[in-house]
Amino acid sequence: MYRILLPVDDDEDRARAQAAFVAGLPAADSDISVVVTHTLTSAEADAPEELRNVERVDTVKLVRDALDERGITVELAEARHPPAEGILDIAAEFEVDHVAMGSRQRSPAGKAIFGSVAQQVILKADVPVTVVGPTPD
């Protein structure tokens, strides 16, 4: 079975695009399993355990439900901070074959100043990484 990691943030449009990417792959409902992960913010990570459950994140629920409807096996995992390192750790832990990152529209200057989680994952991942853009309206 081909295992894909979907690291989602809090943006529902990006999460929908990531779910649509996976659902559109050949044999998605029979030969693909997905690990959905979310990196909790510092404040969320410091919250009591029952409040920092990744299943409470709206975009995680959205992706899980969308893929469940298509018959795609979904596992959930909580990534640690900083996001890129947490994503890479989850990729290694679950031995994924592919990572499908959501894309944020940011200027080149913004990327240079703030960095890009997707860029860090692309450069450091041991598996192929696809950057999924927003779905057309």
Where are these regions (language model features)?
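Small/aliphatic-rich secondary-structure junction motif
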Residues: Y2-A47
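Local beta-strand N-terminus motif with an aromatic residue
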Residues: M1-Y2, D31, E95-D97, A118
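Short, surface-exposed alpha-helical segments at coil->helix boundaries
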Residues: N53-R64
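Short, well-ordered secondary-structure micro-motifs
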Residues: R16-Q18, A45-R52, L88-D89, K111-A112
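General small-molecule cofactor/ligand-binding pocket signal
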Residues: V35-T37, E75-A79, T130
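Structural beta-alpha unit
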Residues: E69-V99, D137
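Gly/Ser-rich helix-loop-strand patches that form or flank binding pockets
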Residues: H98-D137
